[in-house]
Amino acid sequence: MFRTISRKNMSQKLSFLLLVFGLIWGLMLLHYTLQQPRRQSSVKLREQILDLSKRYVKALAEESRSTADVDSGASMAGYADLKRTIAVLLDDILQRLVKLESKVDYIVVNGSATNTTNGTNGNLVPVTTNKRTSVSGSVR
């Protein structure tokens, strides 16, 4: 008899502990979700990347103009190499952003498909298609 009472008591303690843990976890998740700064859309991020790269290239051009008296041939070759390197890096960043976007869209679509409450599963279409344009051609 004592064992059945202690089992119920342990079960209640464990249930209470799990309930408190779940409540704390839920509150922390809610707090984290509300306190996170809003994410910028990928289009804005792409525009910022391109704008910053243009400014950087302009700054390098001005710097190369100021040092053109010293060694114009080598600095211009270095400038062209640097410009190509930046273009390749920016293209790689944009490709990674597109891949990340497609993964997030896939997760969003599949996550919403598993959480249907009415039991009807319609045809699911990805949220976005591959909207990437060739930006690297305009940068190089």
Swiss-Prot record:
It comes from the Eukaryota. Residues 1-35 form the signal peptide. Residues 118-130 have a biased composition (Low complexity). It is found in: Secreted. Residues 131-140 have a biased composition (Polar residues). Its main location: secreted. Keywords: Glycoprotein, Secreted, Signal. Glycans are attached at residue 110. The keyword Signal applies. InterPro entries: CCDC126, MGT5A-like_N. One of its GO terms (cellular component) is extracellular region. Residues 118-140 are annotated as: Disordered. This is Coiled-coil domain-containing protein 126. It comes from Mus musculus (Mouse).
